[in-house]
Each structure stands twice: as structure tokens, then as C-alpha cells.
Design a protein with these regions (language model features):
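Intrinsically disordered, low-complexity, charge-rich terminal extensions
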Residues: 1-135, 139-299
Length: 299
């Protein structure tokens, strides 16, 4: 249930989505398995097993959404083996070579024949919609995070979520924190990554180290900048901040898990308590992090 990473998207104050309308739109984009000749498909599914009819699981000041994707897996080696067998059979029966164009057509035919019977790989991407504070927080990175926002946009256009921009770039801020003091509420953890400027610059990765040690700080003296930095927020959440303002290796510490467990042994109650607690904690963490980066920059 607990998110393991975080990609942030900003919702403008004057364009916070109506969750009821959004859920109605999501119902038009429910997940369905890929058909015979489709390579993949995606769509929304219920985030909570105990509420199978809800595509948006309501939380205090927000909701939880889940996007399911299914990709067919058809290894190139399988297609190649079948193709080689067919080519050999044709050449033996008809006593002629099989040309390049015919091989290409055979390959397409083989792919179409095998695709409906191919194995599938399933993935799920979850997002917290914090309409109270105006954030979409996705438990993914890169293209997967963008796919979630795009799917929400299709469900309720125009859904103007965008990447956030801060007064201080995460890279310059993290470099300053490693060289001096971290902002109130945060403390250095034990991992970081530093790079020399330029595309071909050297990279140094420190893991499970005291980041205040001279041998770590001396990399800053040679001109390297911090691209990833391990931080702990309020002794409650551990994470690695990246220069793209993504939170990796997100870990909710024992104090939060104990709070959630007080909801009891009932699975639905524990799910709701965990999701609500996670939304509230991430809401405050993101607010403190954006403030530590100088606040949001006007666009």
C-alpha cells in the first residue's frame, strides 16, 4: 500500500478537478485486456478490493486512483525460430530460395498468429489526487507517471496538471545542503550522487556513508554538484531526492506504520487508514520540500 517513489504534478488553484465528474469520466476508460491483435492496453481499475465499484477511492481531501496496464510478451527468438522453420519448409517443398520481402511477410503473419496466444505482463500505477493542496502524487517515475496523468486528462479534459517549478533548482539546493545545513525538518541520510559539470563529467556515488565526512565534502571542492541526495523528513519518511524533483526509495518509517496498524486487523479499515495517513504525511512533506526549494516559481 505504501508508495515507494513519488512524481509530482501541480494542479492550478483555479482548476482543481471535481472528483465526482472525474470518476464518471474514468468509467469510460476502464481497463479491458488487449484484444487478439493488440500489443497492450491500459485503463482504470478499483484501487481497493473492498470497494470494487469505485474507480476513485475517496480520502480526506483527495482520492486514490489506479491505472492498470497489460502488455503482451512475444519474444523475438520465438518468432525467429518459427520463421526459420517455415522458410526451411518452403525451400524444401518448392526447391527455391525465400526472398527478403517474402520473409518479412511471413514474419508479420507469424506475429499475427502468435499474438492472441502470447503471455501478458501486468503492471499497476497508483496516484494520490490531493485536491486540497493541489497535487497529483504518482507512485512511479518518467513515462509511467506521465501515462497516469495523460489517462486522467482523457477522463476529464483538459485536466491541466503540470510539472512543478521551484525558485531553486533541486540540484543547486541539494549541493548547498550537502555543503552547509539542510532546511528545518530535514536531515541528511546516508546516500548521495555527485557529478562533474558537462555531459562527460565524472560521477561519484556514496552509499551508507556519513555525508558530513570530509571525504564526501571534498567532492564539492572539485566542482561536483549533487544530483541525488538521501534525506529524512521529520524522522517519519526517508527518501532520495533527485535533480528532477522526484522522490526515490520512499520509505515510511516505523512510527507511521504503527499509527496505521492501530486501525485494527480488519483489512478494509487498515487499507483506508494507511491511505489516509499516507496522503496526509505526503501532503506535509511536499509542502516542506517545496518551501525548502524557495517556493514555486511563477510561470
Amino acid at each position: 500500500m505504501w508508495f515507494r517513489q513519488l512524481a509530482l504534478f501541480r494542479l492550478p488553484p483555479d482548476a482543481r478537478p471535481d472528483l465526482a465528474k472525474l470518476e464518471a469520466g474514468m468509467e469510460q476508460h476502464c481497463f479491458a485486456p488487449p484484444s487478439g491483435l493488440e500489443w497492450s492496453s491500459q485503463g482504470f481499475v478499483a484501487p481497493a478490493g473492498h470497494a470494487p465499484d469505485r474507480l476513485l477511492h475517496p480520502l480526506a481531501g483527495g482520492a486514490l486512483a489506479t491505472l492498470k496496464r497489460e502488455d503482451k510478451v512475444l519474444p523475438a527468438a520465438v518468432i525467429r525460430d518459427v520463421l526459420e522453420s517455415k522458410v526451411a519448409d518452403i525451400e524444401a517443398r518448392e526447391a527455391r530460395p525465400v526472398g527478403r520481402k517474402e520473409k518479412r511477410e511471413l514474419k508479420e503473419q507469424i506475429t499475427d498468429d502468435l499474438l492472441p496466444r502470447a503471455m501478458t505482463k501486468t503492471s499497476r500505477t497508483r496516484a494520490l489526487l490531493d485536491v486540497h493542496a493541489g497535487w497529483i502524487m504518482v507512485d512511479a517515475a518518467g513515462q509511467k507517471a506521465e501515462s497516469m496523468v495523460s489517462a486522467l486528462r482523457e477522463a476529464l479534459p483538459p485536466f491541466p496538471a503540470r510539472l512543478p517549478h521551484t525558485q531553486l533548482s533541486p540540484g543547486s539546493a541539494m549541493t548547498g545542503w550537502l555543503a552547509g545545513e539542510v532546511p528545518d525538518g530535514f536531515e541528511l541520510d546516508c546516500d548521495c550522487e555527485l557529478k562533474s559539470p558537462g555531459d562527460d563529467g565524472a560521477t561519484v556515488r556514496c552509499s551508507k556513508q556519513d555525508l558530513t565526512a570530509p571525504e564526501v565534502r571534498q567532492h564539492l571542492d572539485t566542482g561536483k554538484v549533487v544530483t541525488r541526495l538521501g534525506l529524512v523528513w521529520q524522522e517519519r519518511i526517508r527518501f532520495v531526492l533527485t535533480e528532477q524533483l522526484e522522490l526515490k526509495r520512499l520509505q515510511f518509517l516505523d512510527v507511521l506504520e504503527e499509527q496505521a496498524s492501530q486501525a485494527g486487523d480488519d483489512a478494509p479499515a487498515l487499507f483506508d487508514a494507511t491511505a489516509t495517513l499516507m496522503l496526509g504525511e505526503l501532503r506535509h512533506l511536499v509542502a516542506d520540500l517545496i518551501a525548502a526549494l524557495g517556493g514555486e516559481a511563477e510561470r
